[in-house]
Amino acid sequence: MAATVGDGSGTEEACRNMESKEEFVKVRKKDLERLTTEVMQIRDFLPRILNGELLESFQKLKMVEKNLERKEQELEQLIMDREHFKARLETAQADSGREKKEKLALRQQLNEAKQQLLQQAEYCTQMGAVTCTLLWGVSSSEEVVKTILGGDKALKFFNITGQTMESFVKSLDGDVKEVDSDENQFVFALAGIVTNVAAIACGREFLVNSSRVLLDTMLQLLGDLKPGQCTKLKVLMLMSLYNVSINSKGLKYITESPGFIPLLWWLLSDPDAEVCLHTLRLIQSVVLEPDVFSKVASELQSSLPLQRILAMSKSRNSHLQSAAQELLEDLRALDCNV
């Protein structure tokens, strides 16, 4: 037993010696001092280095946080703007849809109004054509003409007549309207009424004194219409001017109109025999009135389309031939070098 205990005590002591060896390291004093110095330096410098880096990192973090906060605010503002513009877009789309519906409704109303206006215009044209055709027929009576001129609407009627004929000619624009259309008949009837009124002395006097605008309009329209265009209207206007020329004041007024003589030559170039016939008769009125002829003789003789008139004097149309021959005889009588 004693031997056994003694062995155990020796083992424990050996262990303690081993533990003591592990706790200590044998270092030279010089190395220890150097190590101690370095440790002291590290202990002094490390906080400074760490503090500087930490401060820099902290500042960067602050900047990042500020930037992040600004970006968040900008994002929030963008979201608000988006919602605002989205609301405006929805409102605009709603307004646009409503306006489209309103425009569609207005367009339909406009189309309906145009259709109604067209129907009314057609009705008025038909009514005007019928009424004026009837009036044209009865205006060949002197009593009827006196009744027309005796009313307070005569001047207005002739003003409207001139405006209607002018509008009609402007609307042609090279197009050929149907000869039998209500519009044509309406305008022709108006021109026919003027012709019949001018065929009566009191009618000529009224037109010369009170309705010179109508005379100016007819002269203008005769120049506006192209050769061969709307010949019936040309003939009626020429007949009206011829009737007016029977009145001395009427003839004087017509011949003093700017461009009157060139207009006559222009009308003589028309291919329609009726237009040429009534132009010759109007020229003859000028030639047979000494006071008027003396004022236009020089211009008339210098520009007279003699060859055209000579050709008409040989026309197969007996009326045109006769009128041309009579004019040539009148010109020879006046020593016009014909």
UniProtKB/Swiss-Prot annotation:
**What results from gene inactivation?**
Male mutants are infertile. They have smaller-than-normal testes with no sperm. Female mutants exhibit a fertility with 40% reduction in litter size compared to wild-type females. They show reduced follicle formation. Mutant oocytes show a delay in prophase I progression with the majority of cells at zygotene stage in 17.5 days post-coitum (dpc) females.
| Tissues expressing this chain | Expressed in testis and, to a lesser extent, in lung and muscle.
Which coarse location class describes where this protein primarily resides?
A: cytoplasm
One GO cellular component assignment for this chain's record is: cytosol
Statement: the UniProt record of this protein carries the keyword Coiled coil = yes
UniProt subcellular location: Cytoplasm; Chromosome
Q: Where is this region: Interaction with BRCA2?
A: 87-338
The answer to whether UniProt assigns keyword ATP-binding to this entry is: no
User: Quaternary structure per UniProt?
Assistant: Interacts (via C-terminus) with BNC1. Associates with HSF2. The interaction seems to occur between the trimerization domain of HSF2 and the N-terminal hydrophilic region of HSF2BP. Interacts (via N-terminus) with BRME1. Interacts with BRCA2 and BRME1; the interactions are direct and allow the formation of a ternary complex. The complex BRME1:HSF2BP:BRCA2 interacts with SPATA22, MEIOB and RAD51.
- Report the protein's function: Meiotic recombination factor component of recombination bridges involved in meiotic double-strand break repair. Modulates the localization of recombinases DMC1:RAD51 to meiotic double-strand break (DSB) sites through the interaction with BRCA2 and its recruitment during meiotic recombination. Indispensable for the DSB repair, homologous synapsis, and crossover formation that are needed for progression past metaphase I, is essential for spermatogenesis and male fertility. Required for proper recombinase recruitment in female meiosis.
Question: What is the designated name of this protein?
Answer: Heat shock factor 2-binding protein
**Organism of provenance:** Mus musculus (Mouse)
Which lineage ranks, top first, belong to the organism behind this chain?
Eukaryota, Metazoa, Chordata, Craniata, Vertebrata
